[in-house]
């Protein structure tokens, strides 16, 4: 009897570790796109002339060090630091319902440092504190599960970063495609 109980507990633990709830495609796609939007904003704030040495700090047999200079804003060092805090900015996003198509997406409603508040159409946003927390959680999951892809795309690519990361690399927007944030 005790063996059956242990076996039942093991099977339940095994199955529960492999079963994941269905992710809301709008939420996770929105979190990924908002993540890219915030990363690009942070990158634009850094002086483009600022560089950092990357590469091996080992000395080759001929006495030379293999190092390269890369823009600081696109360095793994800087991006990793930014990623640690980026999901806190998800509170500045809300669920937006397009008045024409009724398509839902997450858009930024809070103005940044130099932006005015006049360009935001608040009547089509659905403000809900639980949605904000869900978006932050989804962002944290995206960073946790896809950090390597995020760093790779941001450091190597220049165009269509949201599409490249969120659709091609992670597949988070395959079910739910957007044109803009």
UniProtKB/Swiss-Prot annotation:
One Pfam family from the record: DUF3456
Subcellular compartments: Endoplasmic reticulum
Residue pairs linked by disulfide bridges in the UniProt entry: 29-173, 32-166, 87-139
Signal sequence residues: 1-21
Function: Plays an role in early embryonic development.
Key words, A-Z: Developmental protein, Disulfide bond, Endoplasmic reticulum, Signal
Domain of life: Eukaryota
Family assignment from sequence similarity: Belongs to the canopy family.
PROSITE patterns cross-referenced by the UniProt entry: ER_TARGET (PS00014)
Identification of the protein by name: Protein canopy homolog 1
GO cellular component: endoplasmic reticulum
Domain Saposin B-type: 25-177
InterPro entries for the chain: CNPY (IPR042415), DUF3456 (IPR021852)
Broad class of the protein's primary localization: endoplasmic reticulum
The organism's taxonomic lineage, starting at the top: Eukaryota, Metazoa, Chordata, Craniata, Vertebrata
Span of the annotated motif Prevents secretion from ER: 178-181
């Amino acid at each position: 009897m005790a063996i059956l109980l242990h076996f039942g507990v093991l099977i339940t633990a095994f199955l529960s570790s492999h079963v994941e709830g269905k992710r809301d495609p709008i939420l996770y796609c929105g979190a990924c796109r908002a993540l890219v939007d915030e990363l690009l904003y942070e990158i634009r704030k850094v002086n483009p002339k600022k560089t950092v040495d990357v590469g091996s700090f080992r000395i080759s047999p001929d006495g030379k060090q293999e190092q390269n200079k890369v823009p600081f804003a696109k360095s793994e060092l800087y991006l990793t630091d930014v990623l640690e805090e980026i999901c806190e900015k998800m509170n500045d996003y809300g669920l937006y319902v397009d008045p024409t198509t009724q398509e839902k997406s997450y858009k930024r409603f809070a103005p940044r440092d130099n932006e005015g508040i006049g360009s935001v159409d608040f009547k089509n946003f659905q403000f809900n504190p639980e949605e904000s927390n869900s978006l932050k959680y989804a962002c944290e999951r995206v960073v946790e599960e896809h950090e390597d892809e995020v760093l790779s795309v941001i450091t190597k690519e220049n165009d269509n970063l949201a599409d490249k990361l969120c659709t091609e690399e992670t597949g988070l927007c395959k079910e739910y495609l957007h044109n803009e944030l």
